[in-house]
């Protein structure tokens, strides 16, 4: 364990990624991408392949799904189609991963925030629809700032707003962009092994890794 136990117990601010960390949105994202591809006359992609494209924002997701031959204009038009479809179907199949609700309930005494590369209005709508929004002091998305993760701007803002130093802040996510955002901001990092971005964690190992979010309150409370 890279984080000393005494430091784990003193964490004051917990910053969570959303897709692949708290919520399993894989099917709805895949359906939205494939509906977009169908609309523009392209063949559908597998759920697994689309999931591997998630994590750096909608424009990157759509661009990757369309392939290298797509022009910026093509991507922009397809992104508009995707956003419309997803806005109407984002909660068709999406729910929390096993143990997420229990873990968040145990962590409720600490300051918690969301920092995702997903557009902020979708993030808020999802969290409200799942009954989780009230647990978080701030919900920031990929269009909340001038830059997205792995840039540290969002984390720096959250630490400033919550008046918590970097050595008492933990970034929790499923992908390399979460870990690199944490490193760039000088905070501790926790990777979750169940998210669809988890294979990228080997490229930038987080300070700690967990298989289930219910492990986190145990670690922070010194029970594991």
Give names to the regions the model predicted.
Residues 2-52:
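Active-site neighborhood of HAD-like aspartate-dependent phosphohydrolases
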Residues 4-5, 10, 88-114, 120-124, ...:
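Short, acidic loop-to-helix structural element flanking the phosphoryl-transfer center
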Residues 31, 39-69, 75, 98:
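Alpha-helical substrate-recognition element adjacent to the catalytic core
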Residues 63-102:
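Metal-dependent phosphoesterase signature
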């Amino acid at each position: 364990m890279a984080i000393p136990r005494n430091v784990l117990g003193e964490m004051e601010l917990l910053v969570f990624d959303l897709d692949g960390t708290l919520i399993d949105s894989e099917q709805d994202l895949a359906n939205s991408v494939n509906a977009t591809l169908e609309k523009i006359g392209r063949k559908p992609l597998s759920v697994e392949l689309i999931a591997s494209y998630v994590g750096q924002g909608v424009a990157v997701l759509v661009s990757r799904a369309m392939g290298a031959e797509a022009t910026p204009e093509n991507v922009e038009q397809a992104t508009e189609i995707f956003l419309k479809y997803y806005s109407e179907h984002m909660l068709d199949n999406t729910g929390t991963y096993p143990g997420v609700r229990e873990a968040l309930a145990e962590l409720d005494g600490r300051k918690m925030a969301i920092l995702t590369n997903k557009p902020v209005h979708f993030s808020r709508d999802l969290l409200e629809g799942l009954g989780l929004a009230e647990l978080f002091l701030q919900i920031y998305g990929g269009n909340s700032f001038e830059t997205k993760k792995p840039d540290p701007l969002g984390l720096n803002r959250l630490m400033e707003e919550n008046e918590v130093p970097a050595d008492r802040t933990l970034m929790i996510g499923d992908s390399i962009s979460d870990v690199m955002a944490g490193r760039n901001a000088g905070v501790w990092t926790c990777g979750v092994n169940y998210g669809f971005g988890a294979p990228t964690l080997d490229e930038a190992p987080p300070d700690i890794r967990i298989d289930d979010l219910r492990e986190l309150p145990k670690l922070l409370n010194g029970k594991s």
